[in-house]
Amino acid sequence: MRRYLITSALVVGLASLLVIASMMTLADAQNQPKAKEFRIERSMPKEAVACIECHKMEHPGIFGDWANSRHASANVTCYDCHKAESFDPDVSKEHYKQYERRDLKYGTKEYKVPVAAVVTPKDCSRCHPDEAKQYARSKHANTHKIIWQIDPWLKLGMNSDLERATGCFHCHGTVLKKTKDGSLDPMTWPNVGVGRINLDGSLGSCTSCHTRHRFSVMEARKPEACGQCHLGPDHPQIEIFMESKHGDIYTAFGDEYNWNAAPGTWSAGVDFRGPTCAVCHMSGAGTVLTSHDVTERLAWESQAPLSVRPENFKPFPAKVNHETERGKMKEVCKQCHGKVWVDDHFVKYDKVNEAYNDIYFKPAKKMLDDLYAKGLLDKSKFFDEELEVEFYELWHHEGRRARFGAAMMAPDYTWWHGFYECKKRFVSFTEGGNDLIKHNKKAYKAIDFPAATGNTTRPAQVFGTGK
């Protein structure tokens, strides 16, 4: 009898242990995240569920991207960003047709809601108001307005509308338009240019840097995000960065950076060893706050024909003082460098801008103006005379490379791609100009200048109808 009781007790005890163990295993399993799982049962309106289920089948790439985003983790759905009012100018009429489909469970009128295909900074501002305000006042958001004021390709119609749509406007942004049937004009869409003029009146595109539908802070912090537009012979910032010591450190140690640190906390020496574009121009550092206004922290407009202080840049004058902004940039630099190092770097950079202005640009501009005044060059159209091209590339290509290279400490770009080429271009330009003056002869004009058919009317959405 005693042996039976002992055996029974052991069986009961073992069973209890198994039950407890199984419960612990179940609890542990419940606490383990499942790979790429997204649970739509979490308090979502039926319209949002319809979006997710439909796009999961129709566009699995979009769904997968979103499902792995912070938006999804925070229960921010397609509907939250794309929802619109029926009277909004950017409502997608095409999307209404999806609610007339019989092959989809959610393709019925029960789930019909107005949505906008284009998500704009105005939409993003519902959750990111500060970022939207900062971005709206930046050069990025206003770049379409800037280029229409200074760019001869647009002002004089020297390239075609197709060349603009597939080239210039992809980065600078286009003016979104609709066709007669209410769909987006294919000459203006798709477009994620930083200065895009949206149908709801807002400026820009957040997806220029935070691409849809992941909207990753990691992606925006990496220099490659900036390099999609800031590259090439006229603004090679990505190439310049990669040549610099900062780029060297990024190449060697970038895979060790904590790219997903919370905004405002991304810190030198903690999350990264060397800065990227975002660190210097946008991220918080020391007492300097994070900003989506890339106009800040600049003491020169060195992409302009003549280097000027940002507050004196006529197409888009900064509302802040360059000395204040230089102080912010120095504060960023001092997270990794001593005061003498930082101060001496900017002394040289200031001198580079002054030297470019006085030695190269001003004398060349004076000769160009003299040639126009004497009637030896025709200013009605730019680029159709060789000396106009020479002058343009002196500042727009070589001059920029010299200034940008000095700003980011890339000596090969400052000298061989910059000032060395400036010298060659300057000599070629001035010799050509002096020859015209000496012989009092007009320059040869390219009669068959190709594709000079672009619309020269400045967009009313930017400048108004009275200008």
Predicted regions and their residues:
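Short sequence/structural segments immediately N-terminal
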Residues: 5, 21-467
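N-terminal secretory signal peptides that target proteins for export/translocation
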Residues: 1-7
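Bacterial N-terminal signal peptides
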Residues: 9-22
